Amino acid sequence: MEGERKNNNKRWYFTREQLENSPSRRFGLDPDKELSYRQQAANLLQDMGQRLNVSQLTINTAIVYMHRFYMIQSFTQFHRNSVAPAALFLAAKVEEQPKKLEHVIKVAHACLHPQESLPDTRSEAYLQQVQDLVILESIILQTLGFELTIDHPHTHVVKCTQLVRASKDLAQTSYFMATNSLHLTTFSLQYTPPVVACVCIHLACKWSNWEIPVSTDGKHWWEYVDATVTLELLDELTHEFLQILEKTPNRLKRIRNWRACQAAKKTKADDRGTDENTSEQTILNMISQSSSDTTIAGLMSMSTSSTTSTVPSLPTTEESSSNLSGVEMLQGERWLSSQPPFKLEPAQGHRTSENLALIGVDHSLQQDGSNAFISQKQNSSKSVPSAKVSLKEYRAKHAEELAAQKRQLENMEANVKSQYAYAAQNLLSHHDSHSSVILKMPIEGSENPERPFLEKPDKTALKMRIPVASGDKAASSKPEEIKMRIKVHAAPDKHNSIDDSVTKSREHKEKHKTHPSNHHHHHNHHSHKHSHSQLPAGTGNKRPGDPKHSSQTSTLAHKTYSLSSSFSSSSSSRKRGPPEETGGALFDHPAKIAKSTKSSSINFFPPLPTMAQLPGHSSDTSGLPFSQPSCKTRVPHMKLDKGPTGANGHNTTQTIDYQDTVNMLHSLLHAQGVQPTQPPALEFVHSYGEYLNPRAGGMPSRSGNTDKPRLPPLPSEPPPPLPPLPK
């Protein structure tokens, strides 16, 4: 079988004598005329293929069918404009891109008679064209002996350029030359695809003044492609190729790329409007670098102009064309962008169109070198992943960056310290804001207005609150001011409210502990971490919500135990959140708490759900859409001046009288009609929160406050100052 195939393949390679004695020559066509007809047919096939949106591989296959057909038949008997549509119709089916017969006929008519309207499909002329095309397809099949599998040089070009690790420019140019060889020459009838590929690479090296070094084995690169190739043969064929390019008239050099023309019309690209002369001049300049030969110069102008004139087309060869297609795509893009359309020699025009075509076409060859070239380009273009998001950026991006920020916080121990200090500062600020807000509480009439404020961005909320509390702008409030407020606190009210809230939080905590304490605490720990990250980020909803509920709790304590208990019970019925968050919220959002206290006293019941507002449940409000800008603004104030006082109150918490706390919790639970919870969980919470959950620790600290009306002492060593936040 292999021997038969080789014999069949040899059948389609002809000597110079056979080419000079072709049927068309015998019927009186001179050599130049016959070559011109072949180039015109190739141009028509290229134009039709692009309009039909078939791959460059299909177009190249149709061109080879045409060349072989006219080695058996004459141009005088079968007009090139009739054979070309039939050859493309057949090649499209062979390459598995079949097109409707009606579509092929209409496209052929549009290419040959652009000024005329499309034929009526019911007219006699159209039906006659259909019959002629089908008959011609049958004649082509019989003439070719049903040998429809075509090997193209593009595959070998890609393989060789990959083997020698040629530059992208060299690979693209070589691939382009392979397409030109099909469009402009009869090399496909004289030499095997590997030989043609060597000629194309050699021509590209000469043209661009490149040189491929000898291998470590002492062999030249072409010996790895085809053992029969010699340097003399390459020089001879290169010279012949250049001569053909020089002889090709400009009208054939200019590839009529329909797709490119349409794109040019739509985009009105300026670079495509540049003069033909300019492009040719550029090509000549490039050629002069490699050689002063007039033939080389002609080749250069041809190839360059063709590349510039070509528009994105499909990849050019079957397998090889597919591999080359990638290279050609790169080449086509570069050339097209840099140069306007020019008159190209037919081969050049085809090359360029082919390169453009490569952009849209699949080729098995692309798996070879083209893929490599494309992958290199893609790799280089890939952007480096962005660095960890900074706090400012995170705040700006809000929720989108939340996940990344959470991961960062989990992975960085430094965040733990910052959280610790942050919680302590929040505690102090909470006390401060609590007293100030309580003083001004009467200003706000109803709870409803308050909630919108809380839900609005924190900055707005701060503005609302601060005018009420102290008349200062949220953003403008400074650490010094905060200190002053703390000193001026109304000790009795504030402490009472704090104590109540502490006991409530304690109560909630115990309750949660009695429930799957381990699982809940782990969840709390993670949520706590995230909530911390969220606060700076300004995206978390949990925190703001927590403060509100927690503040409400404290407010209730202010008003009455019964009211607070009823409220807490109602609120707890919402989703249960980590208790830590509640405690943290109390500290973090003092202003909010105070405000909520005021609002709760006025219209408390309608908005709140049922269930004791315990620390664990304070996170229930985490679902609420409170924006954290206020947290952001407040954070800098608290953090700047306040060290981790009792680090979330952990240090103070340890001094709490256990029995008193338990008794208080029992009494509160009984008031609410709930059974007291198990004490052991409480101890676990203390240790856990102390080491893992600074925020949880805040809750115990609160209970500690219950025993001690005084504010927790500031830490001996304040935490390092945090970077200033954006205003």
Swiss-Prot record:
<dbReference type="GO" id="GO:0061575">
    <property type="term" value="F:cyclin-dependent protein serine/threonine kinase activator activity"/>
</dbReference>
<feature type="cross-link" description="Glycyl lysine isopeptide (Lys-Gly) (interchain with G-Cter in SUMO2)">
    <location>
        <position position="343"/>
    </location>
</feature>
<feature type="region of interest" description="Disordered">
    <location>
        <begin position="486"/>
        <end position="591"/>
    </location>
</feature>
<feature type="modified residue" description="ADP-ribosylhistidine">
    <location>
        <position position="489"/>
    </location>
</feature>
<keyword id="KW-0195">Cyclin</keyword>
<dbReference type="GO" id="GO:0140693">
    <property type="term" value="F:molecular condensate scaffold activity"/>
</dbReference>
<comment type="similarity">
    <text>Belongs to the cyclin family. Cyclin C subfamily.</text>
</comment>
<feature type="compositionally biased region" description="Basic residues">
    <location>
        <begin position="509"/>
        <end position="532"/>
    </location>
</feature>
<feature type="compositionally biased region" description="Pro residues">
    <location>
        <begin position="711"/>
        <end position="727"/>
    </location>
</feature>
<protein>
    <recommendedName>
        <fullName>Cyclin-T1</fullName>
    </recommendedName>
</protein>
<dbReference type="GO" id="GO:0008024">
    <property type="term" value="C:cyclin/CDK positive transcription elongation factor complex"/>
</dbReference>
<keyword id="KW-0007">Acetylation</keyword>
<feature type="cross-link" description="Glycyl lysine isopeptide (Lys-Gly) (interchain with G-Cter in SUMO2)">
    <location>
        <position position="483"/>
    </location>
</feature>
<feature type="region of interest" description="Histidine-rich domain (HRD)">
    <location>
        <begin position="482"/>
        <end position="552"/>
    </location>
</feature>
<feature type="modified residue" description="Phosphoserine">
    <location>
        <position position="566"/>
    </location>
</feature>
<keyword id="KW-1017">Isopeptide bond</keyword>
<feature type="modified residue" description="ADP-ribosylserine">
    <location>
        <position position="551"/>
    </location>
</feature>
<feature type="modified residue" description="ADP-ribosylserine">
    <location>
        <position position="477"/>
    </location>
</feature>
<keyword id="KW-0132">Cell division</keyword>
<dbReference type="GO" id="GO:0045944">
    <property type="term" value="P:positive regulation of transcription by RNA polymerase II"/>
</dbReference>
<dbReference type="GO" id="GO:0032786">
    <property type="term" value="P:positive regulation of DNA-templated transcription, elongation"/>
</dbReference>
<dbReference type="GO" id="GO:0070691">
    <property type="term" value="C:P-TEFb complex"/>
</dbReference>
<feature type="region of interest" description="Disordered">
    <location>
        <begin position="302"/>
        <end position="326"/>
    </location>
</feature>
<feature type="modified residue" description="ADP-ribosylhistidine">
    <location>
        <position position="532"/>
    </location>
</feature>
<keyword id="KW-0597">Phosphoprotein</keyword>
<feature type="compositionally biased region" description="Low complexity">
    <location>
        <begin position="302"/>
        <end position="322"/>
    </location>
</feature>
<comment type="subunit">
    <text>Cyclin-T1 is the predominant cyclin that associates with CDK9 to form a heterodimer called P-TEFb. P-TEFb forms a complex with AFF4/AF5Q31. Component of a complex which is at least composed of HTATSF1/Tat-SF1, P-TEFb complex, RNA pol II, SUPT5H, and NCL/nucleolin. Component of the 7SK snRNP complex at least composed of P-TEFb (composed of CDK9 and CCNT1/cyclin-T1), HEXIM1, HEXIM2, BCDIN3, SART3 proteins and 7SK and U6 snRNAs.</text>
</comment>
<feature type="modified residue" description="ADP-ribosylserine">
    <location>
        <position position="554"/>
    </location>
</feature>
<feature type="modified residue" description="ADP-ribosylhistidine">
    <location>
        <position position="558"/>
    </location>
</feature>
<feature type="modified residue" description="ADP-ribosylserine">
    <location>
        <position position="476"/>
    </location>
</feature>
<keyword id="KW-0805">Transcription regulation</keyword>
<keyword id="KW-0175">Coiled coil</keyword>
<dbReference type="InterPro" id="IPR006671">
    <property type="entry name" value="Cyclin_N"/>
</dbReference>
<feature type="modified residue" description="Phosphoserine">
    <location>
        <position position="117"/>
    </location>
</feature>
<feature type="compositionally biased region" description="Basic and acidic residues">
    <location>
        <begin position="486"/>
        <end position="508"/>
    </location>
</feature>
<dbReference type="Pfam" id="PF21797">
    <property type="entry name" value="CycT2-like_C"/>
</dbReference>
<dbReference type="InterPro" id="IPR047320">
    <property type="entry name" value="CYCLIN_CCNT1_rpt2"/>
</dbReference>
<feature type="modified residue" description="ADP-ribosylserine">
    <location>
        <position position="565"/>
    </location>
</feature>
<feature type="modified residue" description="Phosphoserine">
    <location>
        <position position="497"/>
    </location>
</feature>
<keyword id="KW-0013">ADP-ribosylation</keyword>
<feature type="modified residue" description="ADP-ribosylserine">
    <location>
        <position position="533"/>
    </location>
</feature>
<feature type="region of interest" description="Disordered">
    <location>
        <begin position="692"/>
        <end position="727"/>
    </location>
</feature>
